[in-house]
Amino acid sequence: MASATADLIVFGMLSSLFGPLLVTFAQRFHISLPDAGVVLSVYFVGAFCGVPLGWYTIKHLTGNVVLTITLLTMALGATGTALSPNWFGFLASIFVMGVGFGGVDFSLITLLVRTRMEGRARRLSVSNAGYGLGAVIGPVLIVLVHPNNYRYLLGAIGLSAVLLTLGNSGIIAPPMRDAPRRDPIVVGARQRRLILGTFIAAYILYVATETTTAGWIAPQLHRGGLSASLASAITAGFWLGLAVGRVLAGPAERHHSQRRLVLTGLGFAAALCAGAYATGAAPYLYPLVGFSLALVYPMGLIWYTALIPHDGDGVALLILCMMAGGVIGPAIESVMVSSFGIRVVPLVLCGFALACFGVFASALRFTPRDRA
């Protein structure tokens, strides 16, 4: 679990850089802020493509080899991004980094889901808390290094990814095709399609909510009058809330059901995003949005596996499709900002959170007893 957490810390650092650096990217490449926001979508297009790569390799290669391949892919993209002299080369390198992220994210989640049921929620939550911790560190490093020196930061992250490959030798995970056959899926085919389709839609909206929030906090606050450094620090606060919330997943699950944790978190997130329309309140509310969203990702996966046990392929498809949210969410936000101005940001975020709440709530019609 330590290796998985370390990998996700680095990817959290990387993913959290884009939002605070959007203004810098716009100035560096002489483009508009909404055009710079395309970075977020390109990154997740790459992640979407990286999941099938992870899916194929984890079935045919050992877990440590898969993680090494995907980490080196990310390092290649980070190096290219640091050295790119023009916008299109920069976007191509962002895409390659996204491929690495998608592969690592899918591989790690698949490996953790394959572990024994006892303590699985804690392992998922703590490992994903590493992503949140890294995402706290990223904006802080931007403040320390200065946004205009982002290329050095990206180069250092690429080097960190290479060094992390040295710790993969301790991961013992045979190819999935060689793993012992697990119990068969006991849910009927039609019911499985309904449940899987519901959770795919819910997770697309969740990823849209999380990535768009993280990506547009800094531009909104910077245009609202805050310094770039303070806006980056508040983005770090969002990720800190996410990390703290995920660390608390174990105790929370002992007292509340996964569905209650998911729906309560989304409800609070929607209300807080609506409140962030008030410019003075936004800096204080966004860290609370992160805390509210913290348990949705891990608890939603546990909820799904409770409804359809032993469905490794379903989880793989879920992770693949959810990456679309990272493309759709920022793209919609960019269009809305172009049309209505920067103040529309929190309203779009609220809409995503409410839609996600509605789809997850519709999953209440399914129970673990739904068998066919």
Feature locations, PLM:
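Conserved MFS/SLC helix-loop-helix module at the cytosolic interface between two early adjacent transmembrane helices
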Residues: 48-85
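Extracytoplasmic gate region of multi-pass secondary transporters
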Residues: 18-19, 193-244
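Helix-to-loop junctions at the C-terminal end of transmembrane segments
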Residues: 50-62, 146, 245-257, 337
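C-terminal transmembrane helical hairpin of 12-TM major facilitator-type secondary transporters
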Residues: 256-300
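Helix-loop-helix hairpin linking two adjacent transmembrane segments in secondary transporters
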Residues: 118-119, 126-173
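Cytoplasmic helix-loop-helix junction between adjacent transmembrane helices
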Residues: 93-130
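Helix-breaking motifs and short loop linkers at transmembrane-helix boundaries and internal kinks
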Residues: 30, 62, 83-88, 117, ...
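Intracellular juxtamembrane helix-capping segments at the cytosolic ends
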Residues: 103-116, 295-309
